[in-house]
Amino acid sequence: MMKIKIIFSYDGSAFLGSASQPHKKGVQDALSGALSHLGIVSPLLMASRTDKGVHASYAVASVGCGDHFVNLEYLQKQLNKFSHPFIHIKKIEKVKDDFEVRFDVKSREYRYIFSHSSYSPFMASYVHFYPKFDLDKANELLGFFVGKKDLKFFCKSGGDNKTTLREIFIARAYAYKDFSIFHFKANGFLRGQIRLSVASVLKVLEGKMSEKELKEQIEAKKQYNHFLAPPNGLYLSRICY
């Protein structure tokens, strides 16, 4: 028996979330099903969890498989036959037996994509259509998140976190063509943290919340915003070990 690391992407609009679901509608269920077609039935472990409608351009999972799978490129090709169209296997690597796909992670990155173009139903599941905003101001507000923070007011209920302390390495905004993108990198994220953060920044940009209130929420003094940004604009974009 050997352990492999699977790097893959997925279209979150096709699933009820990344974790296994009662009705087998999670990314984990679909990928486990694809593996079972190849005779790999060991439990599949995921590095990160995403909510319904959230996408991933770079996700990681691990699973045990038989030593006879020596040609990992061939395994990748065969696995894609059963994973498409909503999951794509980008790479498969052999890892050490003590590799922990979730707990060995050093950092995770997410991007939230806004489109400022005319609404398109074909893009609606993949971007958040939103009017243009002051990108410099957004960058200033996102900067408040950087550092070691107690983000208890940026967390949905139902998580299994032992602590709400997180270290944010990057929180910035940048433009690409007719899109604005928020980029977050941290040692870990709480459930709903990014969508709550994005929605809070938008509230300040809209004049519905003050900078002082945003800072107080980040400093865990008081919660002013309970709303989450829509899931469709959010992408898990990198996991580093």
UniProtKB/Swiss-Prot annotation:
Domain of life, per lineage: Bacteria
CDD domains attached to this UniProt entry: PseudoU_synth_EcTruA (cd02570)
Gene3D superfamilies in UniProt: Pseudouridine synthase I, catalytic domain, C-terminal subdomain, Pseudouridine synthase I, catalytic domain, N-terminal subdomain
Keywords, ordered alphabetically: Isomerase, tRNA processing
Molecular function GO labels: RNA binding; tRNA pseudouridine(38-40) synthase activity
Annotated binding of substrate, by residue: 110
Pfam families found in the cross-reference section: PseudoU_synth_1
Active site, per annotation: 51 (nucleophile)
BP-aspect Gene Ontology terms: tRNA pseudouridine synthesis
Catalytic activity: uridine(38/39/40) in tRNA = pseudouridine(38/39/40) in tRNA
Function comment: Formation of pseudouridine at positions 38, 39 and 40 in the anticodon stem and loop of transfer RNAs.
Family: Belongs to the tRNA pseudouridine synthase TruA family.
Subunit composition and interactions: Homodimer.
Name assigned to this protein: tRNA pseudouridine synthase A
